[in-house]
Protein backbone atom coordinates (compact mmCIF):
# COMPACT_ATOMS: atom_id res chain seq x y z
CA UNK A 1 0.00 0.00 0.00
CA UNK A 2 1.11 3.57 -0.62
CA UNK A 3 -0.31 6.67 1.00
CA UNK A 4 0.30 10.35 1.57
CA UNK A 5 -0.02 13.70 -0.14
CA UNK A 6 0.81 13.81 -3.84
CA UNK A 7 3.63 16.15 -4.88
CA UNK A 8 1.72 17.96 -7.61
CA UNK A 9 4.88 19.34 -9.25
CA UNK A 10 6.08 15.80 -9.94
CA UNK A 11 2.99 14.72 -11.91
CA UNK A 12 4.03 14.18 -15.55
CA UNK A 13 2.63 16.61 -18.07
CA UNK A 14 0.80 15.51 -21.22
CA UNK A 15 -0.55 12.20 -19.93
CA UNK A 16 -2.44 10.42 -22.70
CA UNK A 17 -5.50 9.92 -20.49
CA UNK A 18 -8.99 11.31 -20.98
CA UNK A 19 -12.16 11.42 -18.93
CA UNK A 20 -14.36 8.43 -19.66
CA UNK A 21 -18.11 8.14 -20.09
CA UNK A 22 -20.75 5.40 -20.19
CA UNK A 23 -19.78 4.47 -23.76
CA UNK A 24 -16.32 3.52 -22.43
CA UNK A 25 -17.75 0.77 -20.22
CA UNK A 26 -17.42 -1.59 -23.21
CA UNK A 27 -13.67 -0.89 -23.35
CA UNK A 28 -13.45 -1.44 -19.59
CA UNK A 29 -15.29 -4.76 -19.88
CA UNK A 30 -12.91 -5.98 -22.60
CA UNK A 31 -9.85 -5.04 -20.53
CA UNK A 32 -11.38 -6.70 -17.44
CA UNK A 33 -12.03 -9.95 -19.30
CA UNK A 34 -8.41 -10.06 -20.45
CA UNK A 35 -6.97 -9.37 -16.98
CA UNK A 36 -9.37 -10.95 -14.51
CA UNK A 37 -11.50 -13.31 -16.57
CA UNK A 38 -14.75 -11.33 -16.19
CA UNK A 39 -16.09 -7.82 -16.53
CA UNK A 40 -16.98 -5.69 -13.51
CA UNK A 41 -20.35 -4.84 -15.06
CA UNK A 42 -22.67 -3.30 -12.46
CA UNK A 43 -19.75 -2.69 -10.08
CA UNK A 44 -18.34 -0.01 -12.39
CA UNK A 45 -21.75 1.55 -12.90
CA UNK A 46 -22.20 1.72 -9.12
CA UNK A 47 -18.81 3.39 -8.63
CA UNK A 48 -19.57 6.00 -11.27
CA UNK A 49 -23.08 6.64 -9.91
CA UNK A 50 -21.60 7.30 -6.45
CA UNK A 51 -19.16 9.97 -7.62
CA UNK A 52 -16.05 8.17 -8.85
CA UNK A 53 -14.39 9.22 -12.11
CA UNK A 54 -13.68 6.98 -15.09
CA UNK A 55 -10.36 7.61 -16.84
CA UNK A 56 -9.42 6.07 -20.20
CA UNK A 57 -6.15 5.60 -22.07
CA UNK A 58 -5.88 3.97 -25.47
CA UNK A 59 -3.18 4.14 -28.11
CA UNK A 60 -1.30 1.90 -30.53
CA UNK A 61 0.45 0.03 -27.71
CA UNK A 62 -2.67 -0.85 -25.72
CA UNK A 63 -5.54 0.46 -23.64
CA UNK A 64 -6.88 0.61 -20.15
CA UNK A 65 -9.06 2.39 -17.64
CA UNK A 66 -9.03 3.58 -14.07
CA UNK A 67 -11.69 4.55 -11.58
CA UNK A 68 -10.59 7.31 -9.22
CA UNK A 69 -12.13 8.63 -6.02
CA UNK A 70 -10.58 11.97 -4.97
CA UNK A 71 -7.24 10.89 -6.41
CA UNK A 72 -7.20 7.41 -4.89
CA UNK A 73 -7.52 4.69 -7.51
CA UNK A 74 -10.34 2.24 -6.91
CA UNK A 75 -9.33 0.24 -9.99
CA UNK A 76 -6.51 0.48 -12.52
CA UNK A 77 -6.65 -2.06 -15.35
CA UNK A 78 -4.58 -1.93 -18.53
CA UNK A 79 -3.10 -4.10 -21.23
CA UNK A 80 0.44 -2.77 -20.66
CA UNK A 81 2.36 -1.56 -17.61
CA UNK A 82 3.05 1.74 -19.40
CA UNK A 83 -0.65 2.49 -19.82
CA UNK A 84 -1.35 1.37 -16.25
CA UNK A 85 1.32 3.80 -15.02
CA UNK A 86 -0.19 6.69 -16.98
CA UNK A 87 -3.62 5.87 -15.59
CA UNK A 88 -2.29 5.73 -12.03
CA UNK A 89 -0.59 9.11 -12.53
CA UNK A 90 -3.90 10.49 -13.86
CA UNK A 91 -5.69 9.26 -10.73
CA UNK A 92 -3.10 10.88 -8.49
CA UNK A 93 -3.40 14.14 -10.46
CA UNK A 94 -6.98 14.35 -9.15
CA UNK A 95 -5.80 14.18 -5.53
CA UNK A 96 -7.86 16.06 -3.00
CA UNK A 97 -5.66 15.78 0.08
CA UNK A 98 -4.25 12.45 1.19
CA UNK A 99 -4.53 9.46 -1.14
CA UNK A 100 -4.16 5.70 -0.83
CA UNK A 101 -3.03 3.25 -3.50
CA UNK A 102 -3.99 -0.19 -2.26
CA UNK A 103 -3.30 -3.75 -3.34
CA UNK A 104 0.20 -3.23 -4.74
CA UNK A 105 1.44 -6.81 -5.03
CA UNK A 106 4.60 -8.29 -6.55
CA UNK A 107 2.76 -8.48 -9.87
CA UNK A 108 2.16 -4.73 -9.74
CA UNK A 109 5.77 -3.56 -9.54
CA UNK A 110 5.00 -1.08 -12.34
CA UNK A 111 3.13 0.97 -9.71
CA UNK A 112 6.15 1.40 -7.40
CA UNK A 113 7.97 4.09 -9.46
CA UNK A 114 4.70 6.00 -9.81
CA UNK A 115 3.83 6.12 -6.12
CA UNK A 116 7.40 6.89 -5.08
CA UNK A 117 7.66 9.53 -7.81
CA UNK A 118 4.48 11.12 -6.47
CA UNK A 119 5.97 11.34 -2.98
CA UNK A 120 3.82 8.65 -1.38
CA UNK A 121 5.08 6.33 1.36
CA UNK A 122 5.02 2.57 0.92
CA UNK A 123 3.90 0.28 3.72
CA UNK A 124 2.87 -3.33 4.06
CA UNK A 125 -0.76 -4.35 4.43
CA UNK A 126 -2.77 -7.54 4.73
CA UNK A 127 -2.94 -10.37 2.21
CA UNK A 128 -5.07 -10.70 -0.88
CA UNK A 129 -6.83 -14.06 -0.79
CA UNK A 130 -8.13 -15.42 -4.08
CA UNK A 131 -9.55 -18.70 -5.25
CA UNK A 132 -9.92 -20.24 -8.67
CA UNK A 133 -8.68 -18.92 -11.99
CA UNK A 134 -8.92 -15.14 -11.91
CA UNK A 135 -6.77 -14.30 -14.93
CA UNK A 136 -3.35 -12.70 -14.91
CA UNK A 137 -4.41 -9.75 -12.70
CA UNK A 138 -1.56 -7.67 -14.12
CA UNK A 139 -1.18 -4.79 -14.76
CA UNK A 140 -4.09 -4.35 -12.40
CA UNK A 141 -4.83 -2.64 -9.09
CA UNK A 142 -8.10 -4.12 -7.84
CA UNK A 143 -10.84 -2.58 -5.80
CA UNK A 144 -11.14 -4.24 -2.41
CA UNK A 145 -14.89 -4.84 -2.50
CA UNK A 146 -15.01 -5.51 -6.23
CA UNK A 147 -11.76 -7.49 -6.86
Question: Which residues make up each language-model segment?
Answer:
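Intrinsically disordered, low-complexity, positively biased terminal segments
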Residues: 13-147
Amino acid sequence: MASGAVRENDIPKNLSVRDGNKQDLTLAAEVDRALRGAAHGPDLKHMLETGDHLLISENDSGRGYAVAHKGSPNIVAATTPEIASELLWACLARADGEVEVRWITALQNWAIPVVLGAGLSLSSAGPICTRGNLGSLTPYLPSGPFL
